[in-house]
């Protein structure tokens, strides 16, 4: 081989390797950004998970409050139903749902 041909071959190989290096650096930067986004998605998923853990107790509390209202009839909510004199003074207010109290039921070891 002529030294000029070897030189041109090595030069084209060098250009090719520089192009591959540039593409590799770009890919590395994109993968680093993707890694950050996946980590952020993981953190956000943990937050959503902790919120969703409470939904069972929230729905249970709403259900209990709703069930406590079922003991009253439609007449209990009518205007003037308390002024007929047949009810004590304490019952002259319209019936309200039971007061809900928040109680932490999580184990101390989970926190």
From Swiss-Prot:
GO CC annotation: cytoplasm; DASH complex; microtubule; mitotic spindle midzone; mitotic spindle pole body
Source species, domain of life: Eukaryota
Tell me if DNA-binding is a UniProt keyword of this record.
Answer: no
- Where do the segments described as Disordered lie? 80-111
Annotated keywords: Cell cycle, Cell division, Centromere, Chromosome, Chromosome partition, Coiled coil, Cytoplasm, Cytoskeleton, Kinetochore, Microtubule, Mitosis, Nucleus
Summary of the function given for this chain in its UniProt record: Component of the DASH complex that connects microtubules with kinetochores and couples microtubule depolymerisation to chromosome movement; it is involved in retrieving kinetochores to the spindle poles before their re-orientation on the spindle in early mitosis and allows microtubule depolymerization to pull chromosomes apart and resist detachment during anaphase.
Drop me one GO molecular function for this one. microtubule plus-end binding
> What is the native source organism of this protein?
Eremothecium gossypii (strain ATCC 10895 / CBS 109.51 / FGSC 9923 / NRRL Y-1056) (Yeast)
For this entry, the protein name equals DASH complex subunit DAD2
């Amino acid at each position: 081989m002529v030294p000029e041909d070897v030189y041109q071959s090595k030069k084209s190989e060098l250009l090719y390797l520089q192009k591959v290096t540039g593409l590799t650096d770009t890919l590395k930067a994109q993968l680093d950004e993707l890694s950050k986004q996946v980590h952020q998605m993981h953190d956000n998923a943990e937050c959503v998970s902790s919120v969703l853990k409470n939904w069972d107790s929230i729905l249970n509390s709403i259900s209990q409050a709703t069930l406590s209202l079922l003991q009253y009839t439609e007449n209990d909510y009518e205007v003037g139903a308390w002024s007929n004199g047949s009810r004590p003074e304490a019952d002259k207010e319209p019936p309200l749902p039971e007061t809900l109290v928040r109680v932490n039921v999580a184990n101390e070891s989970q926190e």
